[in-house]
Amino acid sequence: MEQFFYTETMTVMNADADFRSLLKPSALLRYVEQISTDHARAFGMDDQFFKERGVTFLVGKQALKFDRVPQRAETLTLTSRAQVSKHGSVKRITTLTDAEGKEVAMVDCRWIVASLTEGRILREPGWTVENFWNDTVEGELPLQLHKCKDGLTSAGEWTAHYSQCDLNGHLNNAFYL
């Protein structure tokens, strides 16, 4: 069966690299957030689309795997595929390949559709977009959350400032990495 996907090319910017000129994981997660947004917009799912339906996408869980950490100024091809909602979660796999076509990283992200009016997770989005969703998407990373058995030690408190928040007013998932 044909897989529906969305592809973009990005270059690792200076601000997205660490002191060793290697791509920071936080920057990679921002790239994935951006291609996911661009993919939705390319199929008509823009801000107005979601506003009219009173819903938003939220990141439930995500995991990333580097096969090789890209360097500053390196050009990467990002390819993202979304699976139909199952049990209230949309699986989205994004792969990054280098100029030679070798996979350098993969991100497994589970998106959740939430109703802004009802304040709850929706099992199904309530709409469909032709050639956007795949019945299945190959690839997966471990998404298990490990729970601390001995209690947690506070690392302090942090106030989320305006410049650290996304369009929904939430602390950006990539900010704290």
Which role does the model predict for each range below?
Residues 1-59, 106-108, 114-177:
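Hot-dog-fold acyl-thioester-processing enzymes
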Residues 62-99:
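Hydrophobic beta-sheet segments that form the core/acyl-binding groove
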Residues 101-103:
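Residue-level signal for glycine
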